[in-house]
Amino acid sequence: MLRVAVPNKGSLSESAAEILSEAGYRRRTDSRDLTVLDPSNQVEFFFLRPKDIAIYVGSGELDLGITGRDLARDSGAPVAERLSLGFGRSTFRYAAPAGKDWTVEDLAGLRIATSYPNLVRDDLSARGIEASVIRLDGAVEISIQLGVADAIADVVGSGRTLRQHNLVAFGDTLCDSEGVLIERAGSPDDDSARNQLVERVRGIVFAQQNLMLDYDCPKTILDDALKITPGLESPTLSPLADENWVAVRAMVPIKGHNGVMDELADLGAKAILASNIRSCRAL
């Protein structure tokens, strides 16, 4: 039976549960449940702290896990990303008190508070910078005000929390994070149950990022229209009652699809319809 780790709480939890449910897997009905057995799919789900998931997967005790890229890298566990899931996106950056033009080199000799010590140490080592890394389990922004640290390294979203504490982010991003599906590094690729879950989830992720576009198109502009909507492999063309027209169906990315519809309308296409895709096996 396949054993899969899922975040038990936090920003990744609901999105992970939703994507697995859409992929046809059983979801827990009580937030206190630590395990859920799905006998019809031969899968057992374990609900764990997001920070611990990479450790369990890397040890080989669990086959797959959903966690954040930043958490997986910071764990130091021997895991590999099998699939990017497209939710929980964030950036991980250095920040320090505003009022100075900070560079990463300015961190030399300073105290840096973070909840991701390994990620920070690896970055500093790669840059040849020596600094003291202080591990905190949260609310690292207040550490400078309390005199525990001189700078921080943390997940940055809108930047509102940094501004509230008069901090400014600087330097390159240490990690562009999002939810990821991980497995133990070097896992065999011939596990049918594992591959089935991966492909199901891949289909949901693809469906969330694309939609189906249908429109009627005069044959005189068909070549130009197909350049706008090339589809995944090739668009589907169907004859209409009027032999001078054809119906076109093609997948397009959700991002920017309104612009695509505008282009088709300007070109002369009619009855342009966008519809969501629930799931697919597209790749």
Curated annotation (Swiss-Prot):
One of the record's GO cellular component terms: cytoplasm
The reply to whether Glycosyltransferase figures as a keyword in the UniProt entry is yes
GO molecular function, one example? Answer: magnesium ion binding
The record's annotation in PANTHER family points to: ATP PHOSPHORIBOSYLTRANSFERASE (PTHR21403:SF8), ATP PHOSPHORIBOSYLTRANSFERASE ATP-PRTASE (PTHR21403)
Q: What is the lineage of its organism?
A: Bacteria, Bacillati, Actinomycetota, Actinomycetes, Mycobacteriales
What is the gene called? hisG
Q: How is its activity regulated?
A: Feedback inhibited by histidine.
Pfam families according to UniProt: HisG (PF01634), HisG_C (PF08029)
**Species annotation:** Rhodococcus jostii (strain RHA1)
The cellular location(s) given in this protein's UniProt record come to: Cytoplasm
List this protein's GO terms for biological process: L-histidine biosynthetic process
Which pathway or pathways does this protein act in?
Amino-acid biosynthesis; L-histidine biosynthesis; L-histidine from 5-phospho-alpha-D-ribose 1-diphosphate: step 1/9
Write out the function statement from the record.
Answer: Catalyzes the condensation of ATP and 5-phosphoribose 1-diphosphate to form N'-(5'-phosphoribosyl)-ATP (PR-ATP). Has a crucial role in the pathway because the rate of histidine biosynthesis seems to be controlled primarily by regulation of HisG enzymatic activity.
Q: Which HAMAP family match?
A: HisG_Long
User: Needs which cofactor?
Assistant: Mg(2+)
EC numbers: 2.4.2.17
Tell me the keywords, alphabetical order: Amino-acid biosynthesis, ATP-binding, Cytoplasm, Glycosyltransferase, Histidine biosynthesis, Magnesium, Metal-binding, Nucleotide-binding, Transferase
The catalysed reaction is: 1-(5-phospho-beta-D-ribosyl)-ATP + diphosphate = 5-phospho-alpha-D-ribose 1-diphosphate + ATP
> What InterPro entries does the database record attribute to this sequence?
ATP-PRT_HisG_long, ATP_PRibTrfase_cat, ATP_PRibTrfase_CS, ATP_PRibTrfase_HisG, HisG_C, N-reg_PII-like_a/b, N-reg_PII/ATP_PRibTrfase_C
- Family classification: Belongs to the ATP phosphoribosyltransferase family. Long subfamily.
Name of the protein this chain belongs to: ATP phosphoribosyltransferase
